[in-house]
């Protein structure tokens, strides 16, 4: 590469442009040390020439601080300006025929090039460099040039645009052929695509093409992007850029749901390949009055059926028998004889009818929805009894005056007459039943206190006197009389 540079360095800016066109594959961010190594340039002698080539290759944005500090910056700047001016004058004096030949050469190169992406990228970059140079030259001299030069510039621009379009079409065709050969998955893009400077018209056309391709890609691949499957991974195929998935095991498994709504009128319900019709007559059959069922044998058969067929006990209890799981467990664990049983006969009768069905039908009934089983078997679900709303009784509290008056009356007479109680209720503004309850409760508390004191004295003295026994008999008689009187007129209890 150093020999190429030495051969081209003495021929002027035209050879430098050719060198630039041939070596466009160099990166734009190469440091000065890499340039020096590539071109075989020593640090002391040819630093200015390397900087000139860097400016011609990569534009005026190349950092100038990489120049060795022992060089004179003023001399380098003057040399660079002279080289750049020569380059611009050569470009401005280029005739339309020369630019046409350049475009023809580019087209010939694109036709002869292979289908790979590297050739199309180099052609695009070379076309970009020519376009940039012509646009910068015409922008600087647009105000000073005559009308004829402006027309020539517009012609050059049109030719450049046409040549760029042809290069893009060839590049797209080459990319498509390379992708078809490599069998890549659709939707992947090249990460090292070149940055091309385009006009507003070209950018609009590119956005339209991109939107159309994205719509096509979404329409073709939309069906493949479905819910994720935990059973198998998607198996992609390269035919026409479509992705397919292997079927899930859940889709291949039989559907364990009723395909039709079962009704007693004769419609059939299918569950796991088992057809179930109307079973109300078989499930509601009753035995004669003289017959009896062996409850122990029925319980044993039910337990073995649940274990062998893997049927939950809750499903049998709630869907077939309309009972709770706890009730069924008690009946199966301790079955009573048929002659002794009163309330559980209907449950054992239904269990016996269920055991008389086909084994597959028996199991299917336990896995159908509860409403469907009720329709098929004609089961009426028991309705719970409505509880009566109990009114909460507000507890009465005596005032201090009322309590003192009642206690004083009780000390005077433990059993006041009816007229006396009516007078107290009117005086204290209390109900008649409330006054009667107070005297009854007071007598009960007095009796309890007497029993406690008597028991304490008996433990101390060892025996009860006859007077105490007579007094206890009187208290018992009084309590019985008070109870009969209170039963006629009940009321809330008070302390």
From Swiss-Prot:
InterPro entries: CUT_dom (IPR003350), CUT_Homeobox (IPR051649), HD (IPR001356), Homeodomain-like_sf (IPR009057), Lambda_DNA-bd_dom_sf (IPR010982). Its main location: nucleus. Residues 284-370, 389-449 bind DNA. Disulfide bonds: none annotated. It is found in: Nucleus. Residues 106-120, 149-162, 242-254 have a biased composition (Basic and acidic residues). One of its GO terms (molecular function) is RNA polymerase II cis-regulatory region sequence-specific DNA binding. It holds the Pfam family CUT. Keywords: DNA-binding, Homeobox, Nucleus, Transcription, Transcription regulation. Residues 1-14, 163-179, 199-217 have a biased composition (Polar residues). GO terms for biological process: regulation of transcription by RNA polymerase II. Belongs to the CUT homeobox family. PANTHER family: HOMEOBOX PROTEIN CEH-21-RELATED, TRANSCRIPTION FACTOR ONECUT. This is Homeobox protein ceh-21. It comes from Caenorhabditis elegans.
């Amino acid at each position: 590469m150093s020999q190429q540079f030495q051969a081209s360095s003495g021929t002027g800016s035209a050879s430098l442009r050719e060198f630039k066109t041939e070596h466009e594959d160099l990166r734009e961010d190469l440091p000065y040390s890499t340039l020096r190594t590539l071109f075989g340039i020593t640090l002391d002698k040819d630093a200015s020439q390397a900087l000139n080539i860097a400016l011609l290759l990569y534009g005026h944005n190349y950092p100038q601080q990489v120049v060795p500090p022992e060089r004179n910056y003023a001399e380098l700047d003057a040399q660079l300006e002279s080289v750049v001016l020569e380059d611009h004058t050569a470009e401005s004096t280029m005739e339309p025929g020369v630019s046409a030949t350049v475009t023809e050469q580019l087209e010939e190169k694109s036709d002869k090039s292979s289908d790979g992406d590297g050739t199309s990228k180099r052609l695009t970059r070379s076309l970009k460099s020519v376009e940039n140079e012509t646009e910068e030259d015409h922008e600087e001299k647009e105000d000073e040039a005559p009308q004829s030069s402006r027309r020539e510039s517009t012609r050059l621009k049109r030719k450049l645009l046409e040549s760029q379009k042809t290069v893009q079409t060839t590049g797209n065709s080459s990319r498509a052929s390379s992708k078809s050969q490599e069998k890549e998955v659709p939707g992947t893009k090249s990460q090292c695509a070149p940055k091309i400077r385009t006009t507003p018209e070209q950018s609009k056309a590119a956005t339209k093409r991109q939107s159309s391709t994205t719509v096509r890609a979404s329409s073709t691949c939309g069906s493949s992007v479905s819910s994720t499957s935990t059973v198998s991974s998607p198996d992609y195929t390269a035919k026409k850029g479509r992705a397919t998935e292997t079927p899930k095991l859940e889709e291949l498994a039989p559907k364990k749901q009723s395909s039709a709504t079962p009704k007693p009128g004769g419609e059939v319900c299918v569950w796991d390949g088992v057809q179930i019709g109307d079973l109300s007559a078989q499930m509601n059959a009753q035995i004669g009055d003289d017959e009896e069922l062996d409850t122990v044998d029925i319980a044993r058969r039910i337990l073995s059926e649940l274990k062998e067929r893997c049927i939950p006990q809750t499903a049998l209890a709630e869907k077939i028998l309309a009972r709770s799981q706890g009730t069924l467990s008690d009946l199966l664990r301790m079955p009573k004889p048929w002659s002794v049983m009163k309330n559980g006969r209907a449950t054992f009768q239904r269990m016996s009818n269920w055991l008389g069905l086909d084994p597959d039908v028996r199991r299917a009934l336990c896995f159908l929805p509860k409403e469907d089983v009720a329709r098929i078997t004609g089961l009426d679900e028991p309705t719970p009894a409505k509880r009566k709303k109990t009114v909460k009784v507000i507890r009465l509290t005596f005032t201090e005056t009322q309590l003192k008056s009642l206690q004083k009356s009780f000390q005077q007479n433990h059993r006041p007459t009816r007229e006396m109680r009516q007078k107290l209720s009117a005086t204290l503004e209390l109900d008649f039943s409330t006054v009667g309850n107070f005297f009854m409760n007071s007598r009960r508390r007095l009796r309890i206190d007497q029993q406690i004191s008597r028991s304490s004295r008996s433990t101390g003295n060892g025996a009860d006197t006859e007077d105490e026994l007579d007094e206890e008999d009187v208290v018992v008689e009084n309590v019985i009389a008070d109870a009969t009187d209170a039963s006629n007129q009940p009321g809330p209890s008070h302390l």
